[in-house]
Design a protein with these regions (language model features):
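Generic alpha-helical secondary structure signal
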Residues: 2-5, 18-21, 77, 81, ...
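A short, well-structured juxtamembrane/interface segment
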Residues: 10-30
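Glycine-rich phosphate-binding loops that contact phosphosugars or nucleotide phosphates
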Residues: 33-190
Length: 193
């Protein structure tokens, strides 16, 4: 059986940490949150952003989903600047004080993530990183939530669970599967609830 490193204990330890409380507080205050990640955490970012936006009215949580922009930007500016360029472009219309950038990195050292968080911090965004292990590259004044994971899959699974914890800490709930089926059935039948 696959080892998931006592994920429930890791979740409790993480949610009880001061760094998590800071990240959660910044998340709750923000009206718009950018989530960035690579590899498996790229998809975790997309999944978490989608569900946070869907489950928290009045909050926009976005991840980077444009492959065309990604290849163009990486070609023109270098992969290490990919997320900085996206934030610069998107940030032109943001009220920075209402925004947050959350970086996801299993190693804590993804150059494009740490560079983007440094740029965001210096531009006035609230920032935070969720990492599998302590970063050796992240600037010290950026809040880092360290999951202390041995495996990539544990880090990715726990990070996704933490997005649902953010939904909860923002004062909302995640519907059960049965509740969601009933809600969708009522829409199909024209009985909006």
């Amino acid at each position: 059986m696959i080892e998931i490193e006592n994920i429930e204990k890791k979740l409790k330890d993480t949610v009880g940490s001061d760094n998590w409380k800071k990240l959660s507080s910044d998340f709750v205050k923000a009206k718009k949150v950018y989530v960035i990640g690579n590899g498996g955490l790229y998809f975790t970012a997309a999944h978490g952003a989608t569900d946070c936006t869907r489950l928290i009215p009045g909050k926009l949580v976005v991840s980077f989903d444009s492959c065309g922009y990604m290849t163009s930007c990486a070609n023109d500016h270098g992969y290490e600047n990919l997320f900085i360029r996206w934030l610069e472009t998107s940030g032109d219309i943001d009220i920075v004080e209402d925004c947050m950038v959350i970086g996801l990195s299993c190693s804590g050292n993804s150059k494009n993530i740490t560079r983007a968080l440094s740029w965001a911090k210096s531009s006035g965004y609230a920032t935070g990183m969720i990492s599998g292990v302590q970063s050796k590259r992240l600037e010290k004044d950026i809040n880092e939530v360290v999951l202390n994971c041995k495996y990539f899959h544990t880090c990715e699974i726990l990070t996704l669970i933490l997005f649902y914890q953010l939904v909860h800490e923002a004062g909302h709930t995640c519907p059960t599967i049965i509740e969601e089926i009933k809600r969708k059935d009522s829409w199909v039948l024209g009985k909006k609830k």
